[in-house]
């Protein structure tokens, strides 16, 4: 009897460890997916900031690929339902970004992708680093940044123009303010 209890205990322990390892591996894969998406986004942002349309087109292809492959995993049902619609919007906006024929169209689509990505990041905790949502009142456009300091990708002649918006969901953005 003691041997069979030990065997049952050992079997349960092994099963628990296997499930834990699979869960950890799944979390690592999900985090890697989120990292690829956000890194692709940041490459496009850099190209837009540098007014590098040709280089941006190459990075946009990678961003659109990451957006299309992005899966919503490990969420509560209500978050899943809400983010499914946001994810579909982001896919459509990424396709528009990919088909942009000039820098102005690229910037417009990039702002739309930003708003969807921020909503997803906020819910899924996509990065351990501080990420800030920022806003350009002149262009009425958003972007994400690792820095609190404003480096506006939309206004080449006014790089410091903008405002910091932090921790707000889509639709809760403050009223635009004029730059000084």
Question: How should each PLM-predicted stretch be described?
Answer:
Residues 9-20:
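Bacterial N-terminal signal peptides
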Residues 22-180:
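Intrinsically disordered, low-complexity terminal tails/loops enriched in metal-binding residues
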Residues 1-7:
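Positively charged n-region of N-terminal signal peptides that target proteins for export
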Residues 3, 19-23:
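Intrinsically disordered, low-complexity segments enriched in Ser/Pro/Gly/Ala and basic residues
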